Structures are given as structure tokens and as C-alpha cells.
């Protein structure tokens, strides 16, 4: 049976790991959210989140966005390519309800899967 856990090894933790993705990313985005990805050599995907206070003022909104993004990644982790992903929240993401945010993330994960197959 497939495990849908979210252990520490599936997270980007250090600034150098984030910098690695920012150097040569594949981009997939909507006006409210962008997912940057770069192939890694680990054999499994990892995720990092950036939700700036400048773009999402209230802490509970930032936490909601991060929680929904982590959950979306956790459920799709076995379908995603072995890439490091950085999810960047932009202005207006707090205006999306949970369903709209989840649908936007699903669309972006699918786009990254297509990009990885094409490269």
C-alpha cells in the first residue's frame, strides 16, 4: 500500500536547497501562485513554501495556504517527478477559497508532470 506521509526528507529545509531551485527553475504559475521546480537526484520529490507577509498579511491566512499546499503535495507525491519544488504565494492568493486554491495547485502539479516528461 502507498504511504501518504509527509516526513522530513520530503521538505526543503536549508537556504542552499531553496537556492538550488531558484537558480534554474521550471515555472508553472497562475496569477496567485507559482510553483518552481528543478530535477533532483534523490528519486523523490521535495517541497518548500514561501508565503510572504507582504503578500498575505494575516498569519491565519498564511497558515491556511501552507496547510493546503502541503496537503496537496502529500496526496500527489507519488505521481510527481523527482524534483525539488518551491511554491511561491503571490498577492491575491488569500482571496481564494480552499476549493479554488486546491484546484489551482492540482492544475500546477499536472503542468509540472508534463514539463518533466517533456525535458
Swiss-Prot record:
InterPro entries: Ribosomal_Su5_D2-typ_SF (IPR020568), Ribsml_uS5_D2-typ_fold_subgr (IPR014721), RNase_P (IPR000100), RNase_P_CS (IPR020539). One of its GO terms (biological process) is tRNA 3'-end processing. Keywords: Endonuclease, Hydrolase, Nuclease, RNA-binding, tRNA processing. Pfam families: Ribonuclease_P (PF00825). Disulfide bonds: none annotated. RNaseP catalyzes the removal of the 5'-leader sequence from pre-tRNA to produce the mature 5'-terminus. It can also cleave other RNA substrates such as 4.5S RNA. The protein component plays an auxiliary but essential role in vivo by binding to the 5'-leader sequence and broadening the substrate specificity of the ribozyme. HAMAP family: RNase_P. Consists of a catalytic RNA component (M1 or rnpB) and a protein subunit. This is Ribonuclease P protein component. It comes from Escherichia coli (strain K12).
Amino acid at each position: 500500500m502507498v504511504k501518504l506521509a509527509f516526513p522530513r526528507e520530503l521538505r526543503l529545509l536549508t537556504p542552499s536547497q531553496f537556492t538550488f531551485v531558484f537558480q534554474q527553475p521550471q515555472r508553472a504559475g497562475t496569477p496567485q501562485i507559482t510553483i518552481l521546480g528543478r530535477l533532483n537526484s534523490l528519486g523523490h520529490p521535495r517541497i518548500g513554501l514561501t508565503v510572504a507577509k507582504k503578500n498575505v498579511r494575516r498569519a491565519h491566512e498564511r497558515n491556511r495556504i501552507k496547510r493546503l499546499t502541503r496537503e496537496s503535495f502529500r496526496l500527489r507525491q507519488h505521481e510527481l517527478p523527482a524534483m525539488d519544488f518551491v511554491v511561491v504565494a503571490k498577492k491575491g492568493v488569500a482571496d481564494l477559497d480552499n476549493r479554488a486554491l486546491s484546484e489551482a495547485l492540482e492544475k500546477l502539479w499536472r503542468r509540472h508532470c508534463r514539463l518533466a516528461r517533456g525535458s
